[in-house]
Every structure is written in C-alpha cells, then in structure tokens.
C-alpha cells in the first residue's frame, strides 16, 4: 500500500485531494497553491453550478421553475464564458444547489472527472463526502464569517468592483445557512477530514500545515 507522502510527492502516483468549505473561506487560493506544489489538476466544482445559473439567466429560465432547471442541468456544457465571481450568479447557483436532482445530475459530471484524472484537487462543498469519498486526502477549510466577508470585499475592490461589506456578509451568512441546511449533501466535513480554521492564517501557512500533515501522516 502506497503511503500518503509517496502519493503526494511522487508525480507518477495517482493522488486526489478533496478541498471543502464555506464560501470565501480561502479554498480557491489554497487549492491553487496546493495544485502547483503537488502537480495536481485544479478544479473548482462550483463552476458547474455557476454555469447552470448563467445558463438559466441567458435562457431566461426562472430558477423557481424547478423542472426546467433540472432539465437544463442534464444538458450542461462548460464554456466558462461568464464572470465566475459575479455575486448574482453565485447567489442563484447557491439557490439551485439545494435541489437534490440537480446535485445528482451535476455530481455525475464531477465524479467522472475525478475518476478519469490521475492527480487532482477538487474544491467544493461536498467533495470529500459525496463526489470523492475515497480521496487520498480530505481537507475542510473554515473561517469566521466576518473574516470571510472582509476577504471577499478586498478581492472585489482590488478588481475595481463596487461592493458593500455589510451586503457581502449578509450574502455569506445566507449562503452558509442554505449550504448547511439543504437536504442533499449539506455542508459538513468528512469524518476523516483535516479541518483547518483559516481565520488567523495566511494561505501559505495553511499550505504549510497541510504539507506537514502529509509528511507526518502514518497510514
């Protein structure tokens, strides 16, 4: 049996990391650094939900028309021809993500992607519990909602986007509530996940903690 350290550092080995956590917890930045460090393909699972949200908007489908959205989810094609960080798209994506039929349809795509990619880190909300329960390493990132709102606010400001901190915080709290209370795969860490609170940690400090965990993990 190949140990975790060998899988992580030997690029000839298959190696899968699941990276879960709430919105604006720092998953994206951390995931990209880990992907580069361990030669992994990085995939943000929220893209499929945002793509579906964008398709609903562009095709003028009301997200309350559940049957229409479910039908659309069966025909999803990724083109990434939209602003991934658009808050309106993100909020719609969060609304449709609570529908179990939609999650099932989109998860089929994600599961297939994990199974056919030798070295991957997939980021999302239920990767370690649903999409890749057999991942070699499961990480769950969390942080205080206020800290997360401030981070998102700074990110948007740096890109020249107009935003209001209180509104970002309100949306984060609302999204957390949806994610945790949905019946289909609620936001929870896997029982064997490495849980890291990033409230007082930089992305590099988190990566260092993960690296040390890999080096010292006894299979």
UniProtKB/Swiss-Prot annotation:
<protein>
    <recommendedName>
        <fullName>Cytidylate kinase</fullName>
        <ecNumber>2.7.4.25</ecNumber>
    </recommendedName>
</protein>
<keyword id="KW-0547">Nucleotide-binding</keyword>
<dbReference type="InterPro" id="IPR011994">
    <property type="entry name" value="Cytidylate_kinase_dom"/>
</dbReference>
<keyword id="KW-0808">Transferase</keyword>
<keyword id="KW-0067">ATP-binding</keyword>
<keyword id="KW-0963">Cytoplasm</keyword>
<dbReference type="InterPro" id="IPR027417">
    <property type="entry name" value="P-loop_NTPase"/>
</dbReference>
<dbReference type="GO" id="GO:0036431">
    <property type="term" value="F:dCMP kinase activity"/>
</dbReference>
<dbReference type="GO" id="GO:0005524">
    <property type="term" value="F:ATP binding"/>
</dbReference>
<dbReference type="GO" id="GO:0036430">
    <property type="term" value="F:CMP kinase activity"/>
</dbReference>
<keyword id="KW-0418">Kinase</keyword>
<feature type="binding site">
    <location>
        <begin position="21"/>
        <end position="29"/>
    </location>
    <ligand>
        <name>ATP</name>
    </ligand>
</feature>
<dbReference type="GO" id="GO:0006220">
    <property type="term" value="P:pyrimidine nucleotide metabolic process"/>
</dbReference>
<comment type="similarity">
    <text>Belongs to the cytidylate kinase family. Type 1 subfamily.</text>
</comment>
<dbReference type="InterPro" id="IPR003136">
    <property type="entry name" value="Cytidylate_kin"/>
</dbReference>
<dbReference type="GO" id="GO:0005737">
    <property type="term" value="C:cytoplasm"/>
</dbReference>
<dbReference type="Pfam" id="PF02224">
    <property type="entry name" value="Cytidylate_kin"/>
</dbReference>
